[in-house]
Curated annotation (Swiss-Prot):
GO cellular component terms listed in the entry, alphabetical order: ribonucleoprotein complex; ribosome
Zinc finger (C4-type): 6-36
Functional summary from the UniProt entry: Binds to the 23S rRNA.
Stored Gene3D superfamilies: Ribosomal protein L24e (2.30.170.20)
GO biological process: translation
InterPro entries the record matches: L24e/L24_sf, Ribosomal_eL24-rel_arc, Ribosomal_eL24-rel_N, TRASH_dom
Source species, domain of life: Archaea
This protein's name: Large ribosomal subunit protein eL24
Alphabetic keyword roster: Metal-binding, Ribonucleoprotein, Ribosomal protein, RNA-binding, rRNA-binding, Zinc, Zinc-finger
Assembly and binders: Part of the 50S ribosomal subunit. Forms a cluster with proteins L3 and L14.
Family matches, as HAMAP family: Ribosomal_eL24 (MF_00773)
Organism expressing this protein natively: Methanothrix thermoacetophila (strain DSM 6194 / JCM 14653 / NBRC 101360 / PT) (Methanosaeta thermophila)
Keyword Ribosomal protein among UniProt keywords: yes
GO MF term list: rRNA binding; structural constituent of ribosome; zinc ion binding
Length: 56
């Protein structure tokens, strides 16, 4: 299986978990949790969030 990483916090996503979000333009985002998905949609930058930097 291919190893996937969260598009927001960069943590490893175990197979069978997480969420895949595909935009109409073909961009694909992988999220480990709804927390990461919501922060990405709000336009937050993971560099500025302490808990998200720990996964990088």
């Amino acid at each position: 299986m291919e190893e996937r990483r969260c598009s927001f916090c960069n943590t490893r996503i175990t197979p069978g978990t997480g969420k895949l979000y595909a935009k109409k333009d073909g961009t694909v985002y992988y999220f480990c949790s709804s927390k990461c998905e919501k922060n990405m949609r709000l336009g937050r930058v993971s560099r500025k969030i302490k808990w998200a930097r720990k996964g990088a």
